[in-house]
From Swiss-Prot:
This is tRNA-2-methylthio-N(6)-dimethylallyladenosine synthase. Residues 2-119 form the MTTase N-terminal domain. It comes from Coxiella burnetii (strain Dugway 5J108-111). Monomer. It comes from the Bacteria. PANTHER family: CDK5 REGULATORY SUBUNIT-ASSOCIATED PROTEIN 1, MITOCHONDRIAL TRNA METHYLTHIOTRANSFERASE CDK5RAP1. GO terms for molecular function: 4 iron, 4 sulfur cluster binding; metal ion binding; N6-isopentenyladenosine methylthiotransferase activity. The gene is miaB. Catalyzes the methylthiolation of N6-(dimethylallyl)adenosine (i(6)A), leading to the formation of 2-methylthio-N6-(dimethylallyl)adenosine (ms(2)i(6)A) at position 37 in tRNAs that read codons beginning with uridine. Residues 377-439 form the TRAM domain.
Amino acid sequence: MKKLYLKTHGCQMNEYDSAKMADVLKFSHGLELTEDPAVADVFLLNTCSVREKAQTKVFSELGRWRPFKEKRPHVVIGVGGCVASQEGETILKQAPFVDIVFGPQTLHRLPDLLDSVIQKRKSVVDITFPEIEKFDRLPQPRAEGPSAFVSIMEGCSKYCTFCVVPYTRGEEISRPFDDVIAEVASLCEQGVREITLLGQNVNDYCGLMHDGQVADLALLIHYLAAMDNIERIRFTTSHPSAFSENLIDAYAEEPKLANHLHLPVQSGSDRILAAMKRNYTVLEYKSKIRKLRAVRPDISLSSDFIIGFPGETDADFEATMNLIHDMGFDHSFSFIYSPRPGTPAAQLPDDVPMAVKKERLAILQNRINVKAAEISQSMVGTQQRILVTGPSKKYPDQLSGRTENNRVVNFNGDTPLIGQMVTIKIKEARPYSLWGEIC
């Protein structure tokens, strides 16, 4: 059996895409995943262009793969994802040993691309945007455990000034409503109990229904919650400007919708938000959270922050810190700003010194870490309903799962509990997890 070595950079959407790459090549060519590159026949790198030095990271990885191809010339190396979409033929110029370059929207064509390389021994590039075609040509989803990702839309049409996603993944396109329902139903039959709905801007979902009507994210959640085997529903990533009243109503009406929301705000300064073209103000963001907490008072809130965006002053940063205090975020993905090629913000002077960026990032992360520790400590003594996902990564003799507010809980238990919802009494708050006992 031939082997596939697959490495993924970036977000949950990329993780989902990588799983589909493995599925489609297993179905078409019988390729089995391996964690040992020395025995691999096909190498795939699924890339992310959001963070700093993304291209450098890609070519460094490819450099580590080159000796495998020199030693075994039949090896096929492919580069996919957002860097592939952004760089295209440039990848072949800088790394001529690469055989396949494909974008996020053409991963379903991997079997044909692989056949072309094998037959012609010539590199191929396909970074087109064939809309929603890829979902129609993928194999049936395979569950890897009781929790699964389901992509419900692709691309983004917000065009924030710092972001490359609209240029690398294309405009927003929603999957048909019935297709999403069918995929979730198939996963349920395989034992999945928790679904995470994915999209670059997931709450802009507008799925065409069989009767010609259009379903928004809230309606999709209502339908999924009606499935008996679904115990919990999550979604990511949301955009504040598209966070609707219907979605707030769904939190009020559907107990299966997890008591956690990731809603990236990026900055607490209206001036910086305008420069980012985020299309909301701090007051509007706060208003949506206030309405949400009126129906879910104890909901856990996480966010994204970009530190040191061009023109960010001490006052702008202080406004961000004030927002963090007011909102009580207990987790964040926070990054130092770096210009992404081809974005409007890349034309702005990157005028915040790196030392200042690093200092601000450390201050922000410390504030959020303190809040997260406080919340974790407050959970000691409470009973939490968790979905048991498998053995603990850190403590293999224990089982592990996640609370509704997305905290890892480790506990002693037997393997038949995997895939079940259990109630755990939290006994201890640890730095990156909780520990408890079955009630």
